[in-house]
């Protein structure tokens, strides 16, 4: 390490430069990461790793990492015995941690023995990155998503090159690197002091990702689905006691396939032609990866990794003596919990507890909530603020039944409709559909194919609509606002946000009780002189009055006769395509979404209605005694074998 004299051209403030060896930089960054840890965290981590110092050169095994990140609580259990796909995700996570831990020399991973282990130093650097503390020392413009992609792609590159010499001139190949420091580094400075003097935010090796040609890197599609699935599971578990969270985790891992299908739907936003049979052979480029996750799920990886490392390695929760499963927080304040329990006891009326349904379960809910959050909606969706208002399979597929169930809810709702794509035989022979077809204007000519290559006869089609305003009868005028979002949930992810218009004002929804059903993105339909007619928008979802058929329409070129309430798809293979999803409805559900205030107001409203119903019943029972004698006289109640009476 040596100081180099700087000139006036070195920078505006006559920057001080130092030359560093590769080993010196790695040691300095490791020391800087240690300074970002609190003393209680250092103590906790050393205990978990069973070491005396975090500067030791011990190796952390995949099993160790699973334990440290709370993905396992059994050191002797083989993860592959839990679930093969889960085991694959753990291996991906382990290698990703090794790559990020090699900062700032990311290319080191491809030059070392890929069978090597994760060092404590690499684990700490990776944990500081995933807990977002890197922002305290790196450039504010540092691209976390790019780093994640490198960490997922470099292991594949290392295997492909099979330790062959690389022709790429990495910065890390140079024996000495000259970088800027805040103050001159002195011989007597401790490692921590030296690490703080370095201007990490100007390090070329860091800001240029070790000069790796990221455009040439690729991630295996199957591997990406597995890591997405893992994070969908992790994000589905609410904050609770450690042992309860782990019970949930184990249960959801056993349901891996349920979550995995939504991981595939997310990836189909990148490439609509991906499917379960070609995942192993398909790859994803950085441009595809970046575009999709910045557009739909910008914080998905940051949130997933953050939960793992903050709740795992960096957590200061310690186990109770004599127990491997139960734990307590330090410090622990029982007062809020006591107050909550007392408040619960006082409530006579309880809101329905969340129970999974055919359309909304742990897997689909994690998928929906992550996408809604990623699209920037202020409406938070979780199993802790959802109440099922209507399910067609329970209450019957009737517009009146639907109206009676959802119109009293005065907060946002999630409307989910699902069904089977209509096949040509059904389209040609089903009389009820033929009637709907005469009312819904045809866009495609009869001679044109009504499906694209990515639309299959056996598709299960599911759409969800996030609605911010309360429902109401709208036979003449639409309602809604610009917070409404249409989501395509299956067989692929897509989204259609409300456009901003001072004319339309986001009033894109109608609930028609005059035999014209429900529409999103349509102009008001007409029922005149017994003739019904729909006016679908360019991007719209139309549900006919019997809740039997639905059509999602996506037309690229606007027409003077149609309205446009929603943005067209941004998916690269769909945005320029005209298409329709016509399906026969098999399930329809509406869920109320409430804040704490909304839920409390709704509880009071339902409690009042319950009291009114009980009061009416009480009045009826009391009056029945006085009127019974008269009713028996005229033969309406009592002894029906008698001839009755007359007055």
Swiss-Prot record:
InterPro entries: TLDc_dom (IPR006571)
Domain of life: Eukaryota
Region called Disordered, residue ranges: 325-346
Domain TLDc intervals: 358-594
SMART domains the UniProt entry points to: TLDc (SM00584)
Annotated localization: Cytoplasm
Pfam families xrefs: TLD
Keyword presence, NADP: no
Recorded GO CC terms: cytoplasm
Keywords, in A-Z order: Cytoplasm
Chief place of localization: cytoplasm
Assigned protein family: Belongs to the RTC5 family.
Biological role stated in the UniProt entry: May be involved in a process influencing telomere capping.
Official protein name in the record: Restriction of telomere capping protein 5
Organism: Scheffersomyces stipitis (strain ATCC 58785 / CBS 6054 / NBRC 10063 / NRRL Y-11545) (Yeast)
Gene it is expressed from: RTC5
């Amino acid at each position: 390490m040596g100081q180099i004299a700087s000139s006036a051209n070195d920078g505006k403030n006559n920057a001080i430069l130092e030359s560093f060896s590769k080993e010196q930089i790695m040691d300095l960054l490791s020391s800087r990461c240690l300074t970002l840890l609190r003393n209680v965290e250092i103590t906790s981590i050393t205990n978990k790793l069973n070491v005396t110092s975090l500067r030791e050169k011990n190796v952390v095994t995949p099993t160790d990492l699973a334990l440290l990140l709370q993905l396992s609580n059994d050191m002797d259990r083989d993860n592959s015995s839990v679930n093969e796909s889960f085991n694959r995700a753990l291996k991906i996570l382990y290698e990703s941690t090794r790559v990020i831990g090699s900062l700032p020399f990311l290319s080191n991973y491809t030059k070392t023995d890929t069978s090597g282990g994760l060092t404590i130093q690499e684990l700490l650097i990776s944990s500081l990155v995933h807990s977002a503390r890197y922002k305290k020392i790196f450039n504010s413009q540092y691209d976390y998503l790019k780093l994640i992609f490198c960490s997922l792609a470099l292991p594949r590159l290392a295997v492909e090159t099979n330790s062959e010499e690389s022709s790429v001139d990495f910065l890390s190949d140079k024996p000495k690197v000259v970088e800027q420091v805040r103050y001159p580094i002195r011989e007597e400075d401790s490692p921590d002091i030296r690490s703080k003097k370095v201007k990490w935010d100007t390090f070329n090796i860091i800001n240029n990702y070790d000069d790796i040609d990221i455009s040439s890197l690729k991630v295996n599609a199957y591997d990406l689905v597995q890591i997405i699935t893992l994070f969908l599971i992790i994000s589905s578990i609410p904050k609770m006691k450690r042992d309860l969270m782990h019970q949930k985790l184990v249960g959801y891992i056993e349901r891996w396939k349920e979550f995995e299908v939504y991981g595939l739907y997310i990836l189909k936003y990148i490439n609509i032609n991906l499917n379960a049979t070609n995942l192993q052979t398909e790859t994803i480029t950085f441009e595809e990866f970046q575009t999709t996750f910045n557009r739909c799920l910008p914080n998905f990886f940051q949130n997933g990794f953050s939960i793992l490392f903050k709740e795992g390695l960096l957590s200061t929760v310690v186990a109770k003596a004599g127990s491997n499963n139960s734990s307590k927080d330090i410090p622990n304040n029982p007062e809020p919990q006591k107050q909550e329990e007392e408040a619960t006891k006082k409530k006579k009326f309880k809101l329905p507890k969340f129970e999974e349904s055919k359309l909304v379960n742990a897997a689909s809910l994690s998928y929906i909530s992550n996408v809604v959050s990623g699209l920037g909606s202020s409406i938070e969706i979780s199993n802790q603020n959802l109440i099922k208002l209507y399910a067609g399979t329970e209450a019957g597929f009737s517009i009146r039944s639907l109206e009676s169930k959802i119109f009293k809810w005065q907060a946002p709702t999630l409307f989910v409709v699902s069904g089977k794509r209509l096949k040509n035989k059904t389209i040609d022979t089903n009389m009820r559909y033929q009637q709907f077809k005469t009312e819904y204007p045809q866009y495609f000519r009869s001679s044109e194919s009504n499906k694209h290559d990515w639309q299959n006869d056996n598709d299960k089609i599911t759409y969800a609509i996030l609605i911010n305003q309360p429902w109401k009868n709208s036979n003449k005028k639409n309602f809604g606002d610009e917070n409404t979002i249409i989501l395509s949930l299956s067989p692929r992810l897509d989204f259609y946000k409300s456009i901003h218009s001072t004319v339309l004002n986001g009033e894109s929804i109608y609930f028609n009780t005059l035999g014209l059903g429900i529409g999103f993105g349509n102009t008001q339909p007409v029922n005149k002189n017994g003739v019904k007619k729909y006016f679908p928008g360019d991007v719209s979802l139309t549900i006919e009055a019997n809740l039997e058929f639905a059509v999602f329409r996506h037309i690229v070129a606007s027409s003077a006769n149609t309205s446009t309430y929603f943005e067209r798809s941004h998916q690269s293979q769909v945005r320029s395509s005209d298409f329709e999803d016509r399906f026969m409805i098999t399930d329809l559900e509406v869920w109320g979404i409430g804040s704490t205030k909304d839920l409390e107001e709704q509880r009071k409203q339902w409690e009042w209605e319950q009291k009114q119903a009980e009061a009416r019943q009480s009045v009826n029972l009391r009056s029945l005694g006085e009127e019974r004698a008269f009713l028996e006289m005229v033969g309406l109640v009592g002894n029906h074998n008698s001839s009755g009476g007359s007055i």
